């Protein structure tokens, strides 16, 4: 545990993003440890949660909604909890400082270029959101301008003005989201400056990150989490590993140096494209990535009699489902490593696996999201003899 005093955030009661901000960091870790034990303790000993030395400004991905207040002023920030009311934010205590500064600059440029924020009620306006990713080690910066349609007045001059104030920006992309949806990004993008992606170092590897691809938002704790997961995988260099819900291939590529073969499965085409590029960039010749539903893929492996020694899964907050978990047990790996961002759905899924031939041997919580209620956990399971 670490003894970091609570810092007062002026937006804590309005924003709702940092549910535990009123507690000292040490108190937050104690609370999360108790939650992990309550939900997962029936499966075995829960290790002490791994916290951060500096639990502030850790988010390398920042996205801001844009709108107009009652005085007609352009504002940007986050949606208030359970609403689409924008809480203006210029400097968030958990977001990357440079990313916040870029968003403030964009907000200031809109009036000069006569670009209006999009209004959900009237359907008028242009700019819906801005997304910024910044490489913690590489320093590369990706800026995504999310618009309601393809028209962005003076887009080239706008980008030029933005770069004058922030010359460290690596690439700028316009993403078009014309749908009536709560999703931030739409299906179509146009690169306005740079390569359309950034690269970031994680451990000894380099990864490509495009606008729509999933990538962990806390780089410091991601390394801790992945090294824990690989330790739990127990690789000797002879194993076939399946990396389910593989995203941009980070865990699978991490595992590639200690495995005979790695198979990554992901249903997001953009993420798979990045994963393939990442494997090539890191000379991971023993890794193959497939665009497919993970359940269908594993069921296909089982029907074909193909074997995997280790399956690593890192599903979304909703967890896995019985269809996927039954496919895991059908393939029958000796070890399963479950990386979870939701201990409630993790407990549900561990219940299924322990009823179908597996037992839990290690449970390690990691604090990926300080000041929030979220808990990341790595769990090791082995097949019963």
Locations of regions flagged by a protein language model:
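Short helix/loop segment immediately N-terminal to the Walker
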Residues: 117-124, 241
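Short, acidic/hydrophobic/Gly-rich beta-strand patch recurrent on exposed beta strands
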Residues: 77-80, 144-146, 275
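Rossmann-like S-adenosyl-L-methionine
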Residues: 154-385
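Extended interfacial segments that mediate partner engagement and assembly in macromolecular machines
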Residues: 3-5, 19-119, 132, 136-137, ...
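Short cysteine clusters
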Residues: 9, 15-18
């Amino acid at each position: 545990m670490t003894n970091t005093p609570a810092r007062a955030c002026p937006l804590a009661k309005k924003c709702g993003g940092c549910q535990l901000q009123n507690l000292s960091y040490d108190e937050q870790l104690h609370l999360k440890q108790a939650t992990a034990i309550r939900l997962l303790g029936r499966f075995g000993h829960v290790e002490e949660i791994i916290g951060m030395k500096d639990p502030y400004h850790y988010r390398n991905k920042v996205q801001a909604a844009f709108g107009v207040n009652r005085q007609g002023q352009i504002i940007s920030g986050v949606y208030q909890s359970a609403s689409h009311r924008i809480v203006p934010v210029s400097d968030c205590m958990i977001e990357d400082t440079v990313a916040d500064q870029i968003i403030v600059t964009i907000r200031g440029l809109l009036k000069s270029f006569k670009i209006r924020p999009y209004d959900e009620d009237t359907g008028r306006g242009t700019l819906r959101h801005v997304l910024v990713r910044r490489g913690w080690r590489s320093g590369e910066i990706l800026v995504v301008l999310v618009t309601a349609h393809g028209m962005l007045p003076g887009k080239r001059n706008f980008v030029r003005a933005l770069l004058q104030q922030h010359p460290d920006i690596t690439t700028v992309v316009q993403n078009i989201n014309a749908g009536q949806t709560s999703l931030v990004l739409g299906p179509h993008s146009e690169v306005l400056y740079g390569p359309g992606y950034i690269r970031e170092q994680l451990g000894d590897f380099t990864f490509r990150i495009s606008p729509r691809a999933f990538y962990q938002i806390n780089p410091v704790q991601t390394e801790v989490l992945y090294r824990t997961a690989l330790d739990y995988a127990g690789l000797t260099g002879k194993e076939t590993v399946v990396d389910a819900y593989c995203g941009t291939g980070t865990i699978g590529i991490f595992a590639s140096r200690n495995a005979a073969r790695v198979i990554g499965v992901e249903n997001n085409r953009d993420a798979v494209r990045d994963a393939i590029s990442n494997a090539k960039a890191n000379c991971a010749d023993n890794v193959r990535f497939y665009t497919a539903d993970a359940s269908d893929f594993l069921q296909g492996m089982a029907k074909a009699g193909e074997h995997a020694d280790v399956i690593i899964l890192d599903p979304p907050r909703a967890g896995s489902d019985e269809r996927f978990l039954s496919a895991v047990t059908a393939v029958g790996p000796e070890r399963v490593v479950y990386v979870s961002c939701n201990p409630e759905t993790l407990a549900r899924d561990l219940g299924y696996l322990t009823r179908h031939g597996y037992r839990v041997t290690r449970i390690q919580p990691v604090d990926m999201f300080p000041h929030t209620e979220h808990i990341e956990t790595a769990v090791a399971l082995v097949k019963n003899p």
